[in-house]
Amino acid sequence: MSKEKFERTKPHVNVGTIGHVDHGKTTLTAAITTVLAKHYGGAARAFDQIDNAPEEKARGITINTSHVEYDTPTRHYAHVDCPGHADYVKNMITGAAQMDGAILVVAATDGPMPQTREHILLGRQIGVAYIIVFLNKCDMVDDEELLELVEMEVRELFSQYDFPGDDTPIVRGSALQALNGVAEWEEKILELANHLDTYIPEPQRAIDQPFLLPIEDVFSISGRGTVVTGRVERGIIRTGEEVEIVGIKATTKTTVTGVEMFRKLLDEGRAGENVGALLRGTKREEIERGQVLAKPGSITPHTDFESEVYVLSKEEGGRHTPFFKGYRPQFYFRTTDVTGTIELPEGVEMVMPGDNIKMTVSLIHPIAMDQGLRFAIREGGRTVGAGVVAKIIK
């Protein structure tokens, strides 16, 4: 058993606990690490080690998060747990800790609460497609019918937000009893781990996705043509392949005639690498920072979208005053700022620093985007908000 945990060949999956405050997210996180360490090897983490989560800064936003790791026989998991509700919202919107799937903790003694609903909705908006439910504190509920009612309520809530309510795995357990080593409740943690392994599909690695490179700089090299540089966000680009230049202007096609890294010519550039791509027959002035090079047909330019946004508080260096409809900040996508206007939800007149809000944005230039793309909201180069594209309108 001891050999297994050093094998890094297992698929790596990112998960996290979500749910209403005091429903037992952190206790469950501790229980998972403890029970899985006991059965499959790895390190257990005590409740208080997880609970005093260190502060992190993601894009200037202060978020408290705890990261733990654990193994099942087939996978390695990185798991994020946040102590406060605001931390969750910030985390989900900024994508500070990516989640391929989530464990929604619902106390059987309370049933779904307002934050339960908000976390499910956020999951839907930002594209956490796989959520497993852990019905916690079941040791404190004697009435089987009550458990069934709570379970039904949770399933209905999921269906309401376009999740597969009937097929969502729900585990009835007690994180505290499992943490205390009670065998029947430890079993429930193993059941949960089994759902993690089977319900959340293996995430597609960045390298297996269609090629995309956000353009950071454009150079003209005499006798050779135009070179664009940037970090490959996903996929692989090979010399001789056709690409599209997408965003800001009308989409055009060209061929990559060379890929270089550190002044050496390569056959290909891969996700995560900083490369220069030499483009055939493309003039320096036809391309600009903020556009992307992409596999033809894989991404399209858009101006109007719905988004979930977190507005930085004054303490985080954000605005000191609210903003109103008609607000025109810059929206920073990948490598560049684009001006846009906002529409607030019906009945919302103003947005205060520290709020999270759904807003519809119209940009003055189209940007290559798909659902889940993160952006910053800026005023004169200063970040005042963070957001994620929830739905493309046009």
From Swiss-Prot:
Its EC number is 3.6.5.3. Keywords: Cytoplasm, Elongation factor, GTP-binding, Hydrolase, Magnesium, Metal-binding, Nucleotide-binding, Protein biosynthesis. Residues 174-176 are annotated as: G5. Residues 10-204 form the tr-type G domain. Residues 81-84 are annotated as: G3. Transmembrane segments: none annotated. Gene3D superfamilies: P-loop containing nucleotide triphosphate hydrolases, Translation factors. Residues 136-139 are annotated as: G4. GTP binds at residues 19-26, 81-85, 136-139. It is found in: Cytoplasm. GO terms for cellular component: cytosol. Pfam families: GTP_EFTU, GTP_EFTU_D2, GTP_EFTU_D3. Monomer. This is Elongation factor Tu-B. It comes from Pasteurella multocida (strain Pm70). The gene is tufB.
